[in-house]
Curated annotation (Swiss-Prot):
It comes from Shewanella woodyi (strain ATCC 51908 / MS32). Residues 24-106 form the Lipoyl-binding domain. The lineage of its organism: Bacteria, Pseudomonadati, Pseudomonadota, Gammaproteobacteria, Alteromonadales. It comes from the Bacteria. The keyword Lipid metabolism does not apply. The glycine cleavage system is composed of four proteins: P, T, L and H. Coiled coil: none annotated. The keyword Phosphoprotein does not apply. Disulfide bonds: none annotated. Keywords: Lipoyl. This is Glycine cleavage system H protein.
Length: 129
């Protein structure tokens, strides 16, 4: 069974968010998602300064098995991207909730967080797959 940290929020499309001290949110894909995709070979990230809409495809995770769109769990401006993934996409596999993060976003509507799932709700989504 996949690790699902309780302190994070999740989208049913397998992205997670973690609130940072400055009010921004770090975004990545869940351990379950990286397990389904397999070994990462390339990650395409949004650009710093991009404005995202919740649910918009904004990144791509490409593995030996497939390429998968990554969706913005929140609307807002991209503040940072994980440049380490450019040379080391396998960080998504080895540390999905840590060094394998994708980007940070400053939300334009924090109420959107209420649309995301807690760990228990996300586990239910996985169980239904």
């Amino acid at each position: 069974m996949s690790n699902i940290p309780a302190e994070l929020k999740y989208a049913s499309s397998h992205e997670w968010i973690r609130k940072e001290e400055d009010g921004s949110y770090t975004v990545g894909i869940s351990e379950h998602a990286q397990e389904l995709l397999g070994d990462m070979v390339f990650v395409e990230l949004p650009e710093v300064g991009d404005t995202l809409s919740a649910g918009e495809d904004c990144a791509v995770a490409e593995s030996v098995k497939a390429a998968s769109d990554i969706y913005a769990p929140l609307s807002g401006e991209v503040l940072a991207v994980n440049e380490a993934l450019e040379d080391s996409p396998e960080l998504v596999n080895s540390d999905a909730f840590g060094d394998g993060w994708f980007f940070r976003v400053m939300p334009s509507d924090v109420a959107e967080i209420d649309n995301l799932l807690d760990a228990e709700g996300y586990q239910a989504v996985i169980d239904e797959e």
